[in-house]
Structure formats: C-alpha cells, structure tokens
Curated annotation (Swiss-Prot):
InterPro entries: BetA, FAD/NAD-bd_sf, GMC_OxRdtase, GMC_OxRdtase_N, GMC_OxRtase_C. The keyword rRNA-binding does not apply. The active site is at H473 (proton acceptor). Pathway: Amine and polyamine biosynthesis; betaine biosynthesis via choline pathway; betaine aldehyde from choline (cytochrome c reductase route): step 1/1. NCBIfam families: betA (TIGR01810), PRK02106.1 (NF002550). This is Oxygen-dependent choline dehydrogenase. FAD binds at residues 4-33. It comes from Yersinia pestis (strain Pestoides F). Pfam families: GMC_oxred_C, GMC_oxred_N. One of its GO terms (biological process) is glycine betaine biosynthetic process from choline. It catalyses: choline + A = betaine aldehyde + AH2; betaine aldehyde + NAD(+) + H2O = glycine betaine + NADH + 2 H(+).
Length: 567
C-alpha cells in the first residue's frame, strides 16, 4: 500500500490533518489508529456527564502508569490517554480552554518559533471552532469543533463559586478564551448542540470519511517508522488482535500524531532518540536526538471538597435509580444533566504578583467526586479542582524494549521543584479564602478534604503528596525549537531527517495555562496549512489583556474564616 501521507494516530491532531489534507482531491492519506471506532451509541464516550467512565477501563484508555514518583510518596500515578478514533478528545473532560495569550507569546520568543505568537495562533483557534452563540474577534462560527457555552438556569453553585472568587479579590471574566483569561467566569465545553461529545472524530473525521482519498484503518498498532537512509518512507504496524505485521509506504511524508506519551515511544523504536538508550536496547540508530522523550510536562491538581447545606448539588445524579431518567432525557432530547460535562465555571489567577500571567487554574464542580469517578462523597457537596500551570518540574519517557505492546517507562518527576510546593500551598490557602466568601454562605458546609485539621506547611505537603493527581495534560516530550534538546522545528519537521513530522501536544515547547485539547487542535490546523503549502492565515489584530503592574488581587470582601468556624 502506498499513499502520499501516512498519519499515525487518529486523535485530536491526527484527525485534523486527515480532514484538511484530504480537502485536496489529488492527495491520498492513510490514517492509522491503534484503538477502535468511536461507537456513537456508547454513552460512556458520547454522554458528556459520563466522562469518568472511559477512564475506568481499557477499551478507550491506554491506562498508562508512571514509575514510582519520588516526590509523591513513590506512588505509581495514573496517566490515562485516549485510544480509538478521536484519541484523547474521545475521553477527555471536554473543557474548551485555549491557554493564555502569554503562553504563545512566550513560545514565539524562542529561536525558530517566531510565528507562534498569540496573534499568529488566534486565527487557527477561530478556524477550528463553531461557538453556539456566534463568532467574534476571538471565536469562530464555521469550524468543525462544536463549542457550547453555559446556559441560564444551570446549577446555582457555578454562579456562587464565581461570585466567591470575585469577592476574594480576583477579577471576573466573561470569556476564559477571550480578551482576558485571568479571573473567574463561565467555562465553555466541546459539546454539540444535541448534547453529544464533540470529539475530533465527530467534528473532523465525519467531514472527511466520505472522501475516497482517505483510508482509515483501526486496530493498527504502529511498530516503527521505516527509513531509507535519513528519509522516512513508511510505517510498519500490527493489525488486529493477532498482531499481523503490515507495511504501508508514504510518497511524501509520515505524520506522527501519537500524543505526548506515544510519539516519543514510536520515534525511539524507530531509531530516533537518545543514542545511549537506543544502543542499550539494540535499536539501530537513524538520528541521535537527545530530546526525544525529555522535557515531559503535565498539570497536577488537587480536589478541595465541601459538603453542601442545600440539596442543589449533583449528588442525586450519582444514585443508580436516578440515572435511567437522566439517560433517557439525554438520549432523546440532548438536554439535562447528561448533556453537560459539569465543568461550567472556573478561572485562572496569579497566586502572587511576581507571576506575569496566571499560574493557578480552577475547575468548579457541583459534586464531590474524583475525576475518574472514584471516591464519590455520599452526600450533597461541591469541590474546586486546583493546580499549578507551569511547573518547573520536568520528566521523561523511555521505551523499555522494541515491543510496541509494552508500555514505556514514564516519570513526570512531579513536585521536584521548591516552586511547586510554594504554589500548591498557596493554592490550598487561597481556595479556602474563596470558599469562605459570602456568596457561598448559603451552601458551604464542612470541609471534607483536606479537612480542618490540615493547616501548617507540613500537613499541607503531606496531603499534596498523597492526594494530588494528574489533570491528564501530558505534553512537551518532543518539543519544537532549534536548541540541542529540540526534536522538531516550528513546522513539526523532525530535526536531522526528511519526510517526518510530529504534530500533537508533544511538540509544545512549554505547557500552556489550561487544558490542552483546543491548543492541540490549533497546532494541527496551523501545521496542516504548512504541509499543504497554503498561505498562513493572516495574523489577528485583536487586543488582549496583559497584566503588567496590575495587582494579582484586591482586598477580599471577607478575610478568611478559620476553617473550623465555617457556618
């Protein structure tokens, strides 16, 4: 089999490339996906409120685990990644957050990445998006990704938590993806007008499937990329449960879109990576690139949980006897509790004035439960997910063998910097100040987690080590740039070889301030134009907020109550 392009991975980036490249009728594309179809009748992936279910099994989740994390009580920590058409957009939390403008301006300050400024990227965010309330300078109206905004009549806890953040002295913003990300406000979600998950399989692949120049093969596990000298010429993959070896050839390019965990694995198995590692595993060296699998970054977060004095939380939706009614309303009407991911409010703040742009993110949830659906509190409650955005900690990914079925060695090295500890302690204390504000007086009960007895630095640190979890945002493991640890250039082309690009979250040079999915889609849209030889979209001239000397917060309405005195 021979095609112009072979795309490895039908995820958030791969599906964008498949759709955009096949817009050119004279181009043939093979899309390889290790997982299966995105079954549209499977509520576990299609119902927004069921977002925890795919993380509990292995049909849609690679279910990686880290090596023992040395600063986290040597815990082996979850590292869920999507498997199936849609990739991680098939199992993520559907939060539509793009990052802060300053993230992209920081990228553009690095050598070789000058065209990755916020105003260069904004047109591609807009190109990808259809927002339900219409386009403006920041939002699109004709893109494949359906974005839904929170609606009047949603849970009162969302409004109370935003109001509490403002009363604590932080800004309010009406659009976390608009002029000013900093502050508290409503959170958009990647959900269709009919209440279905808006994965890239639904948004992009559905447009491309009817084209006869696109071939999609599922249950195709990539073994390695093939080379003639320094040129990528094809892909060796294993088909189906039997693992039958198959080979496909690329006339133009191989496009690796495996994500921040799989892409460095595939490069290393293919002979591109740290020379010493490949030599140890008897993998023939094609190109020594020491940065492959290095610079690994993620967001770590904690849950601060509270009981709710009024029966307005989503606790009843967790009870089995209420779930059939919720499911029926969602299935036939696309409305109700099932049609929302329930992350409809959040925010970004600077924990200290020294930060140039927000370093802490909040997701507010009107129920007390772990992200993966475990450890639900058996009473009315609510919680704040809070974590730092740009940790100095860096990890790595290394293959253990040539076998593509074997999971790699993953180490994020969470909380390895003193800055991490300062930020997480600040985050807990600031969250308690927010929860103590008058807006939450009608709802606030006791603090369930960490609990009123967790107060000093040592107690907070012990809680963080034992309870902080991944936000499922691995990135930066094949970073773009032109320094000695860069893996790709600003167009995703792998250094030192020809005919091979990496296009996914792994090529971010530094993790962004927020959830990764929207930015991963933007990256693929932008590089797709480069691959096709199209003129880049014109830079935006939209104004955007820069904090400058603006204080991180003003005086709160209520100075923090002692945790034990919460009414």
């Amino acid at each position: 089999m021979e095609y112009d392009y072979i795309i490895i991975g039908a995820g958030s980036a791969g599906n964008v490339l498949a759709a955009r490249l096949t817009e050119d009728a004279d181009v043939t594309v093979l899309l390889l996906e290790a997982g299966g179809p995105d079954y549209r009748l499977d509520f576990r992936t299609q119902m927004p409120a069921a977002l925890a279910f795919p993380l509990q099994g292995k049909r849609y989740n690679w279910a990686y685990e880290t090596d023992p994390e040395p600063h986290m009580n040597n815990r082996r920590m979850e590292c869920g990644r999507g498997k199936g058409l849609g990739g991680s957009s098939l199992i993520n939390g559907m939060c539509y957050i793009r990052g802060n403008a300053m993230d992209f301006d920081h990228w553009a300050s690095l050598s070789g990445l000058e065209d990755w400024s916020y105003l260069d990227c904004l047109p591609y965010f807009r190109k990808a998006e259809t927002r339900d309330i219409g386009p403006n300078d920041f939002h699109g109206g004709e893109g494949p990704v359906s974005v839904t905004t929170p609606k009047i009549g949603n849970n009162p806890l969302f409004h109370a938590m935003v109001a509490a953040g403002v009363q604590a002295g932080y800004p309010r913003t009406d659009d976390l993806n608009g002029y000013q990300q900093e502050g508290f406000g409503p959170m958009d979600r990647t959900v269709t007008p009919k209440g279905r998950r808006a994965s890239t399989a639904r948004g992009y692949l559905d447009q491309a499937r009817p084209r006869n120049n696109l071939t999609i093969i599922t249950h195709a596990l990539t073994d390695r990329i093939l080379f003639e000298g320094k040129r990528a010429t094809g892909v060796r993959y294993l088909k189906g449960d039997a693992g039958t070896g198959q080979t496909a050839y690329a006339r133009r390019e191989v496009l690796l879109c495996g994500g921040a965990i799989a892409s460095p694995q595939i490069l290393q198995r293919s002979g591109i990576g740290p020379a010493e590692l490949l030599q140890r595993l008897d993998i023939p060296l094609v190109q020594a690139l020491p940065g492959v699998g290095e610079n690994l970054q993620d967001h770590l977060e904690m849950y601060l949980q509270y009981s709710c004095k009024q029966p307005v939380s989503l606790y009843p939706a967790l009870l089995w006897f209420n779930q059939p009614k919720i499911g029926i309303e969602w299935l036939f009407n696309g409305t109700g509790v099932g049609a929302s991911n329930q992350f409809e409010a959040g925010g970004f703040i600077r924990s200290r004035d020294a930060f140039t742009w927000p370093n802490i993110q909040y997701h507010f949830l009107p129920v007390a439960i772990n992200y993966n659906g475990s450890n639900a509190v058996k009473e009315h409650g609510f919680q704040a997910h809070v974590g730092s955005m740009r940790s100095p900690s860096r990890g790595r990914i290394q293959v253990k063998s040539k076998d593509p079925r074997q999971h790699p060695s993953i180490l994020f090295n969470y909380m390895s910097s003193e800055q991490d500890w300062h930020e997480f302690r600040d985050a807990i204390r600031i969250t308690r100040e927010i929860i103590a504000q008058p807006a939450l007086d009608p709802y606030r009960g006791r603090e369930i987690s960490p609990g009123a007895n967790v107060q000093n630095d040592d107690e907070l640190d012990a809680f963080i080590r034992e309870h902080a979890e991944t936000a499922y945002h691995p990135s930066c493991s094949c970073k773009m740039g032109d320094d000695k640890m860069a893996v790709v250039d600003g167009q995703g082309r792998v250094h030192g070889v020809q005919g091979l690009r990496v296009v996914d979250a792994s090529i971010m040079s530094q993790i962004i301030t927020g959830n990764l999915n929207a930015t991963t889609i933007m990256i693929a849209e932008k590089i797709a134009d480069r691959i096709r030889g199209c003129q880049p979209l014109a830079k935006s001239n939209a104004a955007y907020f820069i904090a400058g000397d603006t204080p991180a917060r003003t005086s709160p309405v209520r100075h923090s109550l002692p945790v034990t005195s919460y009414p």
